A protein has these predicted regions:
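A glycine-rich, hydrophobic/aromatic-adjacent loop/helix-cap motif
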Residues: 10-214
Length: 214
């Protein structure tokens, strides 16, 4: 199906781990749809839950630092980890710094279905855009695609101070649980993957301290 502007659309309701998003899945641009038939390898850069819970088939995974972007709790969540009245915060990939993540090569067999699957998971709510990036892996430098935040969207929180972010996360609860649990699980999974993220560790410590005070 195509929108009036010619872009390819996955008109579906997004459901991840039993939670149904209130948002439609964003239209898929033609250049992304063309990747579904790509003869060249298609790599995705993962910085958050895609690293430890990809929910998509993949043929290969490599550690991959990305320069020029960093992992940050920079997006308001009014459903998954918060409510419209009390928004929470979720991870995004924002400009500046660097980010240690994972690069996934999607399988050539069933490539289109894999791209559709990850698009349906990531592209709800008009808060991300998919863009090409260059990452370094142990086997060399490769081109990949990453889902980065859209700074023009109202749910973009910007660069909050440590205390401001901690106060939001410590009390936020949404359809998929508390912001506190989301942050703790993120830190734990990063540690299991051998990834040190100082800002997230400091944020986690501050959130836990606030929780002990309440």
């Amino acid at each position: 199906m195509r929108w009036d502007d010619g872009s390819y659309s996955l008109r579906m309701t997004l459901q991840v781990n039993g939670y149904v998003s209130p948002y439609p899945v964003d239209p898929m641009p033609d250049w992304v749809a063309a990747l579904r038939d790509s003869a060249a390898p298609v790599w995705l850069f993962a910085y958050g839950s895609l690293m430890w819970n990809p929910e998509m088939p993949f043929a290969e995974r490599r550690p991959a630092p990305l320069r020029g972007w960093h992992r940050s709790f920079c997006l308001y969540s009014r459903d998954y980890r918060g409510t419209p009245e009390r928004p929470g915060l979720v991870l995004g990939l924002d400009r500046g710094g660097s980010c240690q993540g994972m690069a996934y090569r999607l399988p050539q067999d069933g490539l289109g279905a894999a791209i559709d699957q990850v698009w349906a998971r990531e592209m709800a709510g008009e808060v991300y855009r998919m863009r090409p990036v260059s990452v370094t892996t142990p086997e060399g430098r490769i081109g990949a695609y990453a889902f980065v935040v859209r700074r023009d969207r109202p749910d973009y929180a910007g660069r909050l101070s440590l205390d401001d972010a901690a106060r939001i996360i410590a009390v936020a609860t949404g359809g998929r649980g508390t912001g506190r649990d989301y942050l703790a699980n993120t830190v734990r999974h990063l540690e299991e993957l051998g990834i040190a993220d100082g800002p997230l560790h400091r944020l986690h410590e501050r959130v836990e301290a606030l929780a002990q005070q309440s």
